[in-house]
Design a protein with these regions (language model features):
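PLD/PLD-like phosphodiesterase catalytic module centered on the HKD motif
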Residues: 1-137
Length: 137
């Protein structure tokens, strides 16, 4: 398997090149997680979102693209939890109200165990993308 430094670009046969750099925000959209998530959803066949917290504001930011992704026939699975009591019930209700059963929404709740992942996995025909890090929705 090839190894890349953080400054190298990887061309994986998609419209644009992807950087293996960390996404930190700033004025360059390519370094913003939000931009990458939206871009990745445009041609995905399925997406798995695994985050410890869901906030209504974050769901609202992604809602239109989630709707478009579903309309194209892609599958969306979301796994979240109530670790530290931070997930907002209004975020869960918003997903169910707007996207209904078209989204597989699951809730991890095991007393005494932490649940703190932040992963976005995009599955395409020939490859998958994975974003991991510190951003919740």
């Amino acid at each position: 398997m090839a190894e890349f430094t953080s400054a190298e670009k990887v061309n994986i046969g998609y419209e644009n090149e992807y950087s293996t750099d960390a996404m930190t925000g700033g004025p360059d959209k390519r370094r913003q997680l939000y931009y990458q998530l939206i871009r990745s959803m445009k041609k995905v066949e399925s997406v798995d979102i695994i985050v410890s917290f869901l906030m209504e504001s974050g769901v609202r930011m992604l809602l239109k693209e989630l709707e478009h992704t579903l309309k194209r026939g892609a599958k969306i699975r979301i796994l979240t939890g109530n670790y530290l009591g931070i997930t907002q019930p209004s975020a869960l209700y918003l997903i169910k109200r707007k996207l209904g059963d078209r989204v597989d929404l699951r809730f991890y709740c095991e007393k005494g165990r932490s649940f703190h992942p932040k992963s976005y996995i995009f599955h395409y025909t020939d490859y998958s993308e994975l974003y991991i890090g510190s951003s919740n929705i």
